[in-house]
Amino acid sequence: GPDSSFLRL
């Protein structure tokens, strides 16, 4: 979802 890039932090 759109949060995927955030979770990669």
From Swiss-Prot:
Main location: secreted
Gene Ontology biological process: neuropeptide signaling pathway
GO cellular component annotations of the record: extracellular region
The keyword Cytoplasm belongs to this UniProt entry's keyword annotation: no
UniProt keyword annotations, A-Z: Amidation, Neuropeptide, Secreted
Domain of life (superkingdom): Eukaryota
Subcellular location: Secreted
Residues bearing the modification Leucine amide: L9
Family: Belongs to the FARP (FMRF amide related peptide) family.
Function summary: FMRFamides and FMRFamide-like peptides are neuropeptides.
Protein's name in the database: Extended FMRFamide-3
Organism: Austrophasma rawsonvillense
